[in-house]
Curated annotation (Swiss-Prot):
Protein name: Deoxyribose-phosphate aldolase
Catalytic activity: 2-deoxy-D-ribose 5-phosphate = D-glyceraldehyde 3-phosphate + acetaldehyde
Family: Belongs to the DeoC/FbaB aldolase family. DeoC type 1 subfamily.
Pfam families assigned: DeoC
Keywords: Cytoplasm, Lyase, Schiff base
InterPro entries noted in UniProt: Aldolase_TIM, DeoC, DeoC/FbaB/LacD_aldolase, DeoC_typeI
Source organism phylogeny: Bacteria, Bacillati, Mycoplasmatota, Mycoplasmoidales, Mycoplasmoidaceae
GO cellular component: cytoplasm
HAMAP family: DeoC_type1
Gene: deoC
Class in the EC hierarchy, top level: lyase
GO biological process: 2-deoxyribose 1-phosphate catabolic process; carbohydrate catabolic process; deoxyribonucleotide catabolic process
Disulfide bond recorded as keyword: no
Length: 223
């Protein structure tokens, strides 16, 4: 049986000028293609939840986004509100500056947000574009120590998004102790398949429909 690629997609819309009708389309497409989740900014959680309430599509919300430069208390509060308004998953940005200082507070912060999430999945964005290869490995281990469910490549707001090398490094460091989400600049079916084969078990993209249409032409199975 072929993999159902649609079931590893987080269809994403987190740009600053997002309008309600764009969220309508995001959610309608997610239901049509049966994507695993949609990912939105905090201001659209309750709006998107109302649209998705009779579907199987999960709702993901970003926290500390896109810079990660909010405090632990702020990230915890933001996650609490998002969950209260209907978020099923949280994608949180790691404090990259504190990580580079090797501060143990980064692990404490991840654990604090995971405690709020409970059984809901927590994905931690490490912004690989700003890290060396060794720092990427260390960041994966920090996320493992923080009890995160996923380590995620990128916000999509830095100078580049996910690369194949990033995911390969993350996959080797993860050692099956944490899952990997690739995101940022994923626009083609080839990128999608390459990143999946490199070890990403969830892929975030703002080009989900186009990718599914390309996959169909390539005769990959999907719903």
């Amino acid at each position: 049986m072929k993999l159902e690629y649609n079931r590893i997609i987080d269809s994403t819309l987190v740009k600053a000028d997002t309008l309600p009708h764009e969220i309508d389309t995001l959610c309608a497409d997610a239901h049509k293609y049966q994507f695993f989740a949609v990912c939105v900014n905090p201001s659209y959680v309750s709006y998107a939840k109302n649209i998705l309430k009779n579907t199987a599509v999960q709702l993901c919300c970003v926290v500390g986004f896109p810079l990660g430069q909010t405090t632990q208390k702020q990230k915890v509060y933001e996650a609490k509100i998002a969950i209260k308004e209907g978020a099923d998953e949280i994608d949180m940005v790691m404090n990259i500056a504190e990580f580079k200082k090797r501060c143990a507070c980064v692990i404490t912060e991840i654990r604090a947000v995971k405690k709020v999430c409970g059984k809901r999945k927590l994905k931690v964005i490490i912004e690989t574009a700003l890290l060396t290869n060794d720092e990427i490995k260390d960041a994966v281990n920090v996320c493992i120590d923080g009890n995160a469910d996923y380590v995620k490549t990128s916000t999509g707001f830095s100078f580049r998004g996910a690369s194949l090398e990033d995911v390969q490094i993350m996959n080797n460091a993860a050692a099956n102790l944490i899952k990997i989400k690739a995101s940022g600049g994923i626009k083609t079916a080839k990128q999608f398949i390459d990143l999946f084969q490199a070890g990403a078990s969830r892929i975030g993209t703002s080009n989900a429909v186009q990718i599914m249409q390309e996959l169909k032409k390539m005769n990959h199975e999907y719903h």
